[in-house]
Amino acid sequence: MELNTFISRLFSAAEAAGIAPAEAACSQSDSFRVRVRRGELEDYQVSENAGLTLRGRVNGRIGTASTQALTEESIPLLIQGVLESAALIETDEQDDILPPDNSYASVCNDSEAVTALTAEQKIALAREIDEKLRSDDPRLTPDTCAVATGEETFTLKNTLGLDLSHHSNMIYAMANVVARDGEHAATDYETRWGYGLDAIDAETLAESCKRESLMKLEAGRMKSGAYPVVIKNSAMGDLLATFCGVFSADNVQKGPVSYTHLTLPTTERV
């Protein structure tokens, strides 16, 4: 069923069941992925997915229900799911259903260049990366490379007048090389992404992957102690990603939470 028609019928059924206001969030996505390993096309995947979540207020509580089938048969199941889940809610801390704001900031993260790419172009890029991964250095062995694209349309509507939709897409490529020297072995995994073929240079990606894997061959263990260090930007990014939850005000407010890494009173501004 066409999405707007489905949501319209869903809201009518929700109103008849005493669910007001009601809100529907829907994600529709397409993805493509090809993987090449040492000259051979190893994997090829094309998929389409859709998912819709209905939220609605019932007796002061907001219930939710989800489906992946936008069919007439799904509507009563969603309504029943919202009614049942709302009856189980015990907390007053819920994200409310709100009317639309006067305006919204524009975010552009899609490109016609990605949509226009053919499967043949993506496969050709993957094969080119695989070719560039090969090296005269006997220590280096190409492993795998992949090229993928993804597109998503996200729609958010409610019975208070909100009606928003956003389309996004991207292309990304990854390469993996194994380096061996005697008993030492290392691997490197590099990725690039953007909004068109011009964002991914096969040679640059492959050379970076080979260079980084060779650098890791020199790594070794160190005795415990205090050392001056220089941290690579990508390593610092991984470190911050691991511990970012420690700095979450939301997590602190939900307490009691004990963070051994960060002990601050919740009233102190930092």
Regions found by a protein language model. Give the residues of each.
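Single conserved hydrophobic/aromatic residue that forms the stacking wall/gate
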Residues: 261-270
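Active-site bordering "gate/hinge" segments
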Residues: 1-262
